[in-house]
Amino acid sequence: MKEKIFIMSGLLGSGIASLFGGWDLALQTLLLCMVVDWFTGGILLPAVFQKSLKSENGALESRAGFKGLCRKGMVLLVVLIAARLDLLMGTRYIRDGVCIGFIANEMVSIMENAGLMGIPLPEMIKKAIDLLKDKETT
C-alpha cells in the first residue's frame, strides 16, 4: 500500500512539474520565495510581531490569508500559461522571464517583511519598496 502511495505521489508530482515546464531552478526558486513570503508576511508578521499590513489591528486574519493564497495561486497560473506559450512557440524564455519577474516581486515583499520585523535594510531596497508601493496606489 505504501509503495502505491509513493508511486502515485511521484506520478502526480512529475505530471504537475511537467505542466509548469519542468522542475528547474526558476520554478524551485519562485516556489521557495513564495513560501518564504507567505510565512514571513502571512504568519510571522501577524502572529508574532502583530505588524501585518493586511489587517486593521496587525494580527492574523483568515480573510487576508486566504486572499494572499489566492494571489499566489494566480501567480502559479500565470507561470503555467507562460510555460504553455513556450511550448506553443517553441521557445524557452517566456516562462523563465515570468518566473524571474515574480521572483523579483516576491523578494521585494520578503525584504519589506524583514523591514517590518525591525531588520535594517539597505537604502536601495527601501527605495525599491517605496517605488512599488507608489505604483500600487496609482
Q: Which residues does each PLM region occupy?
A:
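Mid-chain, well-packed structural core segment of small domains
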Residues: 66-103
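Short, strongly hydrophobic alpha-helical membrane anchors
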Residues: 1-20
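Canonical alpha-helical transmembrane segment with a positive-inside/aromatic-interface signature
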Residues: 107-138
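Juxtamembrane helix-capping/reentrant segments at transmembrane boundaries
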Residues: 51-75
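Alpha-helical transmembrane segments of multi-pass membrane proteins
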Residues: 30-41, 75, 79-83, 101-109
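A cytosolic-side transmembrane-helix exit/cap motif
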Residues: 46-60, 113-124
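Hydrophobic alpha-helical transmembrane segments
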Residues: 4-8, 27, 31, 73, ...
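Helix-coil boundary and interhelical linker segments in multi-pass alpha-helical membrane proteins
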Residues: 16-27, 85-94
